[in-house]
């Protein structure tokens, strides 16, 4: 199994990099992890809606270039479905049993995701209505992926 995480923008915070590296290492015994950062677009301070759409479209093109044609794609979006960890774990297992070898997770930039990327997605999930920095969401997501594997293993990690 392959887990691909496509994100917009470069992660700069060392504490987040360290956490992501730790969980990636833990996941490695279950799946190959690929972390892909695509460049973000600079957003003018008082950008119009049209400018924001153009920015998301450019970022969306970069994301689309990294999605494999046979990937199962899960986007993180505020309007996505909220899942308990156990359900998320079961979904990951079901995806694999359905014949997909790569699950691709996508976290957009500060403006969100281009509509074309959302339409390409097989599933949209949300971690709640709170607004969190997209850099922090990388760590939260990778921890939940690790937790999903631990649930599948019946590990006491998830209590």
Swiss-Prot record:
One of its GO terms (molecular function) is rRNA (pseudouridine-N3-)-methyltransferase activity. S-adenosyl-L-methionine binds at residues 76, 108, 127-132. Gene3D superfamilies: 3.40.1280.10. It catalyses: pseudouridine(1915) in 23S rRNA + S-adenosyl-L-methionine = N(3)-methylpseudouridine(1915) in 23S rRNA + S-adenosyl-L-homocysteine + H(+). This is Ribosomal RNA large subunit methyltransferase H. Specifically methylates the pseudouridine at position 1915 (m3Psi1915) in 23S rRNA. The gene is rlmH. Homodimer. Belongs to the RNA methyltransferase RlmH family. Pfam families: SPOUT_MTase. Its EC number is 2.1.1.177. It comes from Leuconostoc citreum (strain KM20). Keywords: Cytoplasm, Methyltransferase, rRNA processing, S-adenosyl-L-methionine, Transferase. The keyword Transport does not apply. GO terms for cellular component: cytoplasm. It is found in: Cytoplasm. InterPro entries: Alpha/beta_knot_MTases, RlmH-like, tRNA_m1G_MTases_N.
């Amino acid at each position: 199994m392959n887990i691909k995480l496509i994100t917009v923008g470069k992660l700069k915070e060392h504490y987040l990099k360290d956490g992501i590296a730790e969980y990636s290492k833990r996941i490695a015994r279950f799946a190959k992890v690929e972390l892909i950062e695509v460049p973000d677009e600079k957003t003018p301070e008082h950008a119009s809606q049209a400018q924001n759409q153009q920015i998301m479209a450019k970022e969306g093109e970069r994301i689309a270039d990294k999605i494999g044609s046979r990937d199962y794609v899960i986007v993180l979006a505020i309007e996505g479905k909220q899942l308990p960890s156990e359900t998320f774990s079961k979904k990951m297992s079901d995806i694999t049993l359905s014949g997909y070898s790569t699950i691709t997770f996508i976290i957009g930039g500060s403006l969100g995701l281009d509509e074309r990327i959302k339409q390409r997605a097989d599933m949209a999930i949300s971690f709640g209505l709170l607004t969190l920095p997209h850099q922090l969401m990388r760590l939260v997501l990778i921890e939940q992926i690790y937790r999903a594997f631990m649930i599948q293993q019946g590990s006491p990690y998830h209590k």
